[in-house]
Curated annotation (Swiss-Prot):
One of its GO terms (molecular function) is carotenoid dioxygenase activity. Induction: The expression is subject to photoinduction and is transcriptionally co-regulated with the genes of the other carotenoid biosynthetic enzymes. The gene is carT. Binds 1 Fe(2+) ion per subunit. This is Torulene dioxygenase. It comes from Fusarium fujikuroi (Bakanae and foot rot disease fungus). Belongs to the carotenoid oxygenase family. Its cofactor is Fe(2+). GO terms for cellular component: cytosol. Transmembrane segments: none annotated.
Length: 577
């Protein structure tokens, strides 16, 4: 089929329907059976290094710095009290953080050095001792040999962290720890250092784990309660939002109870002070699993998808995992949006709804001021997200499905034609802001869908030019799928103005991860830069950092390791000090 081979493909709106239908054809042909991807998920090792990687091609010297990535690493624990412990859901893989030091040398050849470190050794030790996993997980299947009493008792044990989702640098307002600040002076190979005051790893729990930027050693944990005493709930978003101009950090805190409460807050980058922008406690505003949200120039916007928690959130304490705590998908359960003012202390200023759906990742949001037919100035808000028709994708990330153990891929995705819901659509909504605050929690207003770009012309794990966050923009980079594997199998640059797409595809078995766009210093064009992506070669069980031209998606170079590195979730590039 048109996109099944390796190369770079230029596609237009006219190709969308055919390319989307080819995903279905590839899935029905069970193409994943010839695409090995176990190396991306299983038997992954720690390499504290640093180890020099083999560079082929070029990486621009101006991209010097460090590319950090984090995600699940080890997925099994050998020799526990009950034998081998297997992690069942990818999101619960034991955290491992990776650092790729990109170092320009005097002779003009860039060097790339690699190191990694596990971030959940305490939890692994606990599993080794007990033979089962205690504490809150995303989707770990319950051990049938563990009794109710033992499960209940784990609710009262100290929390063991598995921070494996996203990386946050230069986080304001966090407490300083003199014992750990000293470690930040350690340098990498050839005296390499990055320009950051701190580095944290997050998850969808309110705690974030500080790590040493050079050694990757896990250090102290900070919770949102340390930022402000009212932020006492257990849930939040892995993806905090940052104002690209001020550096201010935004997120929300979700507390369960008789009436669940959302608190949207801002941490001032200059002062480190935390301000609660809005407190929303209403039975018509349900608690839900959310992984990301939206930021515009003047607003913080929360979209509550159909992934509602049962028992007003309290079922999480009974089930001990997120998946089993969520209500089944209901197409009548619309997405509910909360618009919060972030400039003038107005709190909740608007609400609206959109059709039932689910999403992991927001892409971007922005505002436009327009004049209506009467000459009155109005503000339109635009929201872009990688939207799924329902919640089927969540259980598609069980390791058995990802690695096709015992034909699990076909059993899951072919049942009830679930494969029709495996690929996201880049969706844009437009909402006209009321001229006066109308915090109506009946969600009677609605937004208009104004753009939809299907896979593989857009995909998951989306990233943009970092300085365009919350502002009008044109390009998004993402990891897409053609139906050739159980994960993603392509990288795509999507032009939101024209709906054109440039799609990079590697050889069979080469599974890419999240693309990270690094702008060229001083560049004016939004796509003038490079794209980094970690690619796992499942055929040879190796990995490499791929460097693509941000304009054309053509390969510039790659830095190869002679071992596999976990596909992981998210990363950031920090410039050299």
């Amino acid at each position: 089929m048109a996109l099944n081979g390796p190369g770079v493909y230029h596609r237009t709106r006219e190709h969308e329907q055919k390319d989307a239908s080819d995903i279905t054809k590839n899935i029905l042909a069970e193409s994943w059976k010839s695409w090995p991807n176990e190396a991306a998920f299983d038997r992954l090792e720690e390499h504290r290094g640093p180890l020099r990687l083999t560079l082929k091609g070029t990486i621009p010297s101006w991209a010097g710095g460090s590319l950090y990535r984090t995600g699940p690493g080890q997925s099994r624990v050998e020799d526990t009290a009950r034998g081998t412990h297997f992690t069942t859901h990818w999101f619960d893989g034991f955290a491992q953080t990776h650092r790729f030091d990109i170092i320009p040398s005097e002779d003009g050849e860039t060097q790339v050095w690699y190191s990694s470190r596990r971030q959940a050794d305490e939890w692994i030790a606990d599993v080794k001792k007990k033979g089962w996993r205690s504490g809150m997980t995303f989707g770990q299947k319950a051990d049938p040999c563990v009794g109710i009493f033992a499960k209940v008792m784990t609710l009262f044990e100290p929390k063991l962290g598995n921070h494996n989702v996203a990386l946050l640098a230069n986080v304001p307002g966090v407490p300083k720890d003199e014992k750990t600040e000293v470690l930040n002076g350690v340098t990498g190979p050839l005296g390499h250092r990055v320009n950051t005051s701190n580095l944290f790893v997050s998850t969808d729990y309110t705690g974030i784990r500080r790590i040493d930027p050079s050694t990757l050693q896990p250090l102290a944990e900070t919770t949102q309660y340390d930022l402000h005493p009212s932020l006492s709930g257990p849930c939040s978003c892995s993806h905090a939002q940052r104002d690209p101009d001020s550096g201010d950090l935004f997120n929300f805190n979700l507390a369960f109870g008789r009436v669940p409460t959302y608190r949207i807050f801002r941490v001032d980058a200059a002062s480190g002070e935390t301000e609660v922008l809005a407190t929303i406690s209403d039975l018509n505003v349900p608690p839900a699993y959310m992984h990301s949200f939206f930021l515009t120039e003047n607003h913080v916007v929360i979209c509550i998808p159909a992934s509602h928690y049962a028992w007003r959130g309290l079922k999480t304490q009974w089930e001990g995992n997120i998946i089993d705590s969520m209500k089944p998908f209901d197409k009548e359960r619309k997405c509910k949006w909360l618009v919060v003012d972030r400039r003038h202390g107005k709190g909740l200023v608007a609400t609206f709804s959109t059709p039932a759906a689910f999403f992991f990742h927001s892409i971007n949001a922005f505002e436009k001021n327009i004049e209506d037919e009467d000459g009155t100035e109005q503000t339109d808000l635009f929201f872009d997200l990688a939207k799924y028709n329902n919640m089927d994708i969540i259980k598609g990330f069980y390791y058995d499905v990802l690695m096709d153990r015992d034909d699990a891929t076909k059993k899951y995705w072919f049942k009830n034609d679930r494969y029709k819901n495996c690929a996201p659509t880049l969706t844009r909504y437009r909402f006209r802001l009321p001229s006066a605050p109308t915090p109506d929690t009946t969600f009677s207003a609605s937004a208009e869908q104004v753009l939809a770009i299907p896979s593989p012309h857009a995909g998951e794990l989306p990233t943009i030019h970092p300085l365009r966050n919350g502002k009008p923009y044109r390009y998004v980079y993402s990891a897409s799928l053609r139906g050739l594997t159980t994960s993603v199998d392509a990288l795509v640059k999507t032009d939101l103005d024209t709906s054109e797409a440039f799609i990079w595809t590697g050889p069979e078995g080469h599974t890419p991860g999240e693309p990270v766009f690094v702008p060229r210093p001083g560049a004016e064009a939004e796509d003038d830069g490079i794209v980094f992506s970690l690619v796992v070669d499942g055929v040879n069980e190796k990995a490499y950092i791929l460097c693509l031209n941000g304009k054309t998606m053509e390969e510039l170079g790659r830095a190869e390791a002679d071992f596999a590195i976990g596909q992981g979730f998210h990363g950031i590039h920090l410039p050299a000090a």
